[in-house]
Amino acid sequence: MNTNQRIITIGTICLIVGIISLLLQIGNIILLWMSHSIQTGEKSHPKVCNQSVITYENNTWVNQTYVNISNTNIAAGQGVTPIILAGNSSLCPISGWAIYSKDNSIRIGSKGDIFVMREPFISCSHLECRTFFLTQGALLNDRHSNGTVKDRSPYRTLMSCPIGEAPSPYNSRFESVAWSASACHDGMGWLTIGISGPDNGAVAVLKYNGIITDTIKSWRNKILRTQESECVCINGSCFTIMTDGPSNGQASYKLFKMEKGKIIRSIELDAPNYHYEECSCYPDTGKVVCVCRDNWHASNRPWVSFDQNLDYQIGYICSGVFGDNPRSNDGKGNCGPVLSNGANGVKGFSFRYGNGVWIGRTKSISSRSGFEMIWDPNGWTETDSSFSMKQDIIALTDWSGYSGSFVQHPELTGMNCIRPCFWVELIRGQPKESTIWTSGSSISFCGVNSGTASWSWPDGADLPFTIDK
């Protein structure tokens, strides 16, 4: 084969290889186009998923503490339908209290990232119950926890997390800047009320579904404050009560009616010689009942009941089983203030059943320790100190603190009545213990008409922490 033939042969082979390569590239392009067309066609014509529920789980490890960020069930083909919580039912008949939640946040906080907080409370929508709490802008076992015994500071915020979970930066939702707060759900959205600012000019900021909708300026310029527990929603309207004025004398008290976070009406109570602070409120047959703290002069608790037009009645729980702390020993009650040993107080609650009343109170008459529930069948209207049932919640030797009411609506439970529930704050740290911080965990109970247990469910944290030594 001469030189020209070799050149022609090599050229032919190269040409054939090039043509084959070109054909392969064209084939790849055609296959890619066909694949894209098939995928696009499938997206345009989605198939119906045979499963009714799809579950997504996101899990994160933080400082060797396992935190389940979310566990959300999504019903295929279904959306969350807003409703209006009616609030027209009566309270469910109950014979005792079943434990509902315990977050153990102080115990967990010795190792994990847990908020320093106080004033926890619980509120439920028609879909879930959440724990709300006032943080100090600090974590347990950290240097910024120093001095958090202080009630009011610019670092305090209202946050919330799923009920029963220890409140951490990884499972909590910011709600408002606040050192006094309330929150509730009307079936369509969350209303939050956060009070912050100077003692002589604080402002309450109202948010509906996270958006600022209204404000309330302090009208007496003496520490505007609100419930530290849930507000009440009935038929699309929500209600709260606020205090402005002295903590040890006659103050001013206002009822507020709100719709979608906007104030539509307010009135000032005509309540001489009464003192209302930190009211625990609940709905009952279309009305609102609030049981409050008298920090001025009473061992028993004041109440205010009002309808949706804010027409109200006021009084004190008549029972000789006194509910405040500090308080006198049980004895002769009064339908007005029981003045013996009545100065100072603690947030608390009661549930009215006709002439009877469930009274929640500390076991100690002088310190915030222990907790018990007492059923006085005539205690709302009669002044004797007899009662028919007592259920132990926290032992006398263990710390308690604030307590308050919340309810579960029929739209959540499927029952035909409103279930009464309560929470108890378990305060740890200063001023009673040798720490640099003050914080708390919480437990909650709900009323049932079946078997219950008397026991003690204390905070249980072993103090002091490393930061305190």
Swiss-Prot record:
Positions of region (Head of neuraminidase): 91-469
Q: What are the boundaries of the region Hypervariable stalk region?
A: 36-90
Required co-factor(s) are: Ca(2+)
Q: Which UniProt keywords apply?
A: Calcium, Disulfide bond, Glycoprotein, Glycosidase, Host cell membrane, Host membrane, Hydrolase, Membrane, Metal-binding, Signal-anchor, Transmembrane, Transmembrane helix, Virion
Asked if the Swiss-Prot or TrEMBL record annotates the protein with the keyword Calcium, the reply is yes
The membrane spanning regions, by residue number, are 13-33
Virion surface side of membrane: 34-469
Glycosylated where? Answer: N50, N58, N63, N68, N88, N146, N235
Subcellular location, in the record's words? Virion membrane; Host apical cell membrane
Q: What is this protein called?
A: Neuraminidase
Which modifications occur after translation, per UniProt? N-glycosylated.
Say which domain of life the source belongs to.
Viruses
How activity is controlled: the entry says: Inhibited by the neuraminidase inhibitors zanamivir (Relenza) and oseltamivir (Tamiflu). These drugs interfere with the release of progeny virus from infected cells and are effective against all influenza strains. Resistance to neuraminidase inhibitors is quite rare.
Further remarks about this protein from its record: The influenza A genome consist of 8 RNA segments. Genetic variation of hemagglutinin and/or neuraminidase genes results in the emergence of new influenza strains. The mechanism of variation can be the result of point mutations or the result of genetic reassortment between segments of two different strains.
**What does the annotation say about its assembly with partners?**
Homotetramer.
InterPro entries, per the entry: Glyco_hydro_34, Sialidase_Influenza_A/B, Sialidase_sf
Residues engaged in binding Ca(2+): D294, D324, N344
Q: Where is this region: Involved in apical transport and lipid raft association?
A: 11-33
Family membership, please give it.
Belongs to the glycosyl hydrolase 34 family.
Give the GO molecular function terms: exo-alpha-sialidase activity; metal ion binding
Q: Which residues lie on this side of the membrane: Intravirion?
A: 1-12
Q: Could you name the active-site residues? A: D151 (proton donor/acceptor), Y402 (nucleophile)
Whichever gene encodes this chain, its name is NA
Q: Disulfide connectivity?
A: C92-C417, C124-C129, C184-C231, C233-C238, C279-C292, C281-C290, C318-C335, C421-C446
Q: Which CDD domains does the record associate with it?
A: Influenza_NA
Instruction: Enumerate the catalysed reactions.
Output: Hydrolysis of alpha-(2->3)-, alpha-(2->6)-, alpha-(2->8)- glycosidic linkages of terminal sialic acid residues in oligosaccharides, glycoproteins, glycolipids, colominic acid and synthetic substrates
